[in-house]
């Protein structure tokens, strides 16, 4: 029984995820920070973001996935895991690149929070203007 491990790092906003894919003897488990997917992300929309690369490549129940994720919030962590999983899947099988690229999962989402400016309330929100 050949047990292979593949690794991918994903980032989104301030979150970073390390994804380990193990093939061989597997039953489709997804473990995030030593908790199951349902325990770590109880909402269905974040679960679907994470599982998306596996569904597209039809590998949902064929691989065991172990993830450690740090920083950011729920959305950022889900995006980081998705990106890391895509990179690990590309290590697992380079032929998946075309399928994952067509859906837009290979490219990192580089959007970051814009910094707050001096004299403004937020990044772009100005104080209320009074003519008189």
Curated annotation (Swiss-Prot):
This is Small ribosomal subunit protein uS9. GO terms for cellular component: cytosolic small ribosomal subunit. HAMAP family: Ribosomal_uS9_B. Pfam families: Ribosomal_S9. It comes from the Bacteria. It comes from Blochmanniella pennsylvanica (strain BPEN). Signal peptide: none annotated. The gene is rpsI. Gene3D superfamilies: 3.30.230.10.
